[in-house]
Design a protein with these regions (language model features):
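Conserved SAM-binding loop
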Residues: 111
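Electrostatic, structured charged patches in enzyme active sites and in nucleic-acid/phosphate-binding
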Residues: 51
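Arginine/glycine-rich "motif VI" loop of SF2 helicases in the C-terminal RecA-like domain
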Residues: 129-135
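Accessory recognition modules or surfaces
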Residues: 33-43, 47, 88-99
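Active-site metal-binding core of divalent-cation-utilizing nuclease and nuclease-like domains
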Residues: 58, 63-106, 114-117, 139, ...
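Nuclease catalytic cores
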Residues: 35-40, 44, 55-59, 63, ...
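Domain-level recognition of nuclease-like catalytic cores that cleave nucleotide substrates
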Residues: 1-37, 121-122, 136-157
């Protein structure tokens, strides 16, 4: 990863019992995001889908439209690859799951079509990153009036 100059952000926050805001200075080390070009194209394709279809459709409609847009963007992908889930030393899987997309064999994409993303959606996508052994993912929600997304990074523990 390439390091850039340090950036200073000023964050103002208040608590219920305070009248004056607390000003904190946060130094952020700006750096190139892993697979930034791929995720940028995926997000752009997602905006194209949302701008055309809007919200209110079932998730599968957005999956099909996004598959078309990813192809138009020149990205290779696989849809709903089945992945087995193992527990400890058990020799057989205890279950299986399918992520919506794996793009360029590097970025997991999980779609939702709900009014707002919930913690359970985030937990699901993070678990998929672990199961698929991928470092970067996008959780994209088409269900609200504006497209929303979260960029996910698998923590290595």
């Amino acid at each position: 990863m390439k390091n850039c100059d340090k950036i200073t952000d000023i964050v103002r926050s208040t608590t219920k019992n305070q009248r004056n805001p607390i000003i904190r200075i946060i130094r952020v080390q700006a750096m190139e995001l892993k697979y930034e070009q791929i995720t940028h194209k995926i997000i752009g394709a997602s905006f194209e889908v949302h701008n055309f279809l809007g919200n209110g459709f079932q998730e599968v409609i957005y999956q099909r439209a996004l598959a078309y847009e990813l192809t138009q963007a020149g990205l290779s992908f696989e849809r709903e690859i089945e992945q087995h889930i193992y527990y400890k030393n058990l020799p057989h899987p205890i279950g299986k799951r399918r992520a919506d997309f794996v793009v360029e064999h590097k970025v997991l994409v999980e779609l939702k079509a709900t009014i707002q993303l919930e913690d359970v959606h985030l937990a699901q996508a993070l678990n998929y990153l672990k199961v698929y052994k991928l470092d970067v993912g996008l959780l994209i929600n088409f269900g609200s009036k504006s497209l929303t997304f979260k960029r996910l990074i698998r923590s290595i523990t």
